[in-house]
Amino acid sequence: MTNLIEQSIDKIESWLAKKGFALLKSKLPTIQDEVDFERKVVFLSLRSKPECQLYSLLHECGHVVIRTRKDYSIRFAASVEREENPSKNETNRSIVEQIEEEILAWREGQALANKLDIYVNDGKYYKYGFRWVMSYITLGAIGKEHYLPIAFQQEETNTKKQITKEELTRLLDNAHETCYNQVIANPLDKDQ
């Protein structure tokens, strides 16, 4: 399986090169899965399981697909404005656009896997993606000053420490009870 994943990552790296992007893979703790659009570099952390690396890389490529479309600056205008002026406060629109882009990036990653004939276990791919999307939803709901992003990364080492239920309840006291109980409280346990 690992050899198949390595071959898949090589296919994606070739696809990125055709798009004018380089792939930088590293085990350094400072490297996170992300795209630097100014330098045209996709960063891939090698600290997670190979299957998760593949899924993360497909997701980051989804961002490349989305952001290189001609209509990106129109469709995601608030996000573009926020990136150009980081001191500007986030708006509801920029938060929603960020979440929308994250969801679309997972879908575009899946489409790229199909295009490149890369095997992806759909259930695992979307479960992994849902976990990260929930992190952005939580971030948007509670604000950056209360967010613990490392909590979502530590799951792979069986440390499931996240924001406590009490902290989240206090911060989201206006959240609908059903939404909180079924989605926010247990994002890793639900395939929603």
Name the predicted role of every residue range:
Residues 2-21:
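Basic/hydrophobic alpha-helical interface regions
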Residues 3-7, 100, 124, 163:
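Alpha-helix boundary/N-cap detector
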Residues 26, 30-35:
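Intrinsically disordered, low-complexity, basic-enriched segments
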Residues 41-56:
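Short pre-active-site segment immediately N-terminal to the catalytic Zn-binding motif
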Residues 98-115:
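An active-site-proximal "capping" alpha-helix that borders the catalytic cofactor pocket
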